């Protein structure tokens, strides 16, 4: 399974982008990668990090937090600075909880 720029519903019901890659020889473990307070899922070397872990048979999920300044249509260019201004750590924790629920709906046989 390989989902790129899929949508999940994050904090306050705000849609954001998520990637999920499950290798053929999946070991049942998924790494959930969180980019940090001022970042996004496709910044820098994060795709290389994903590739490394998938080659080790881990599933890999990375996502934009719902209030990182990106949108579901444009996750990179910071088109919504107002949402970023309303971001909190609590919203990012809620996003993580919602991503785990999203994974439970998408992936069978993982140890989450």
Language model features: what each stretch is:
Residues 82-111:
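Alpha/beta-hydrolase active-site loop
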Residues 1-26:
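N-terminal cap/lid segment of alpha/beta-hydrolase-fold proteins
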Residues 24-70, 74, 78:
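Short, surface-exposed "cap/lid" segments of acyl-processing enzymes
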Residues 30, 111-112:
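Residue-level recognition of the N-termini of beta-strands and the immediately preceding loop/turn
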Residues 8, 43-46, 60, 102, ...:
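A residue-identity detector for tryptophan
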Residues 22, 45, 92-95:
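General structural feature for long, well-ordered alpha-helical segments within catalytic domains
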């Amino acid at each position: 399974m390989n989902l790129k720029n899929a949508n999940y519903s994050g904090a306050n019901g705000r849609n954001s982008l998520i990637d999920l890659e499950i290798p053929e020889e999946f070991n049942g473990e998924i790494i959930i990668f969180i980019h940090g307070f001022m970042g996004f899922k496709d910044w820098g070397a994060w795709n290389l990090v994903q590739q490394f872990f998938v080659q080790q048979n881990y599933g890999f999920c990375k996502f934009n937090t719902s209030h990182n300044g990106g949108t579901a249509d444009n996750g990179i260019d910071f088109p919504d600075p107002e949402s970023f201004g309303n971001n909190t750590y609590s919203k990012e924790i809620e996003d993580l909880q919602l991503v785990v629920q999203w994974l439970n709906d998408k992936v069978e046989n993982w140890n989450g």
